[in-house]
Amino acid sequence: MKVAFWNIRGFHLPLKQKGVEALVRKRDIGLVAVLETKLTVNGLDALMKRRFKGWMQVNNFGTHAGGRILILVDPMRIQLEALVILPQVIHCRVTCKVSSCSFLLSCVYGFN
């Protein structure tokens, strides 16, 4: 299972969306956490349909305007359980469906 993090500084731009999609496909990444997305809920819906069809996502958009943390997961390979969602952190349990290996993951974005 491969995991990636990217502080994207604006995931609403098509070039950046394409870059993350290319990285995920080229490196066979099953989970990618994108920080500082600046996405709206509508923008996220469009992104999921266009670039990550069939993937699931967890975000903290409901706790902070401007969408700070977005976790994208391939549900065929990884099970993700969100445990706590706060404005600066998402805590979750990640389980690999192939190996049954499980670990806790915290994705943090600190405000300036």
Language model: regions and residue ranges:
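A shared catalytic/ligand-binding motif for oxyanion handling
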Residues: 1-112
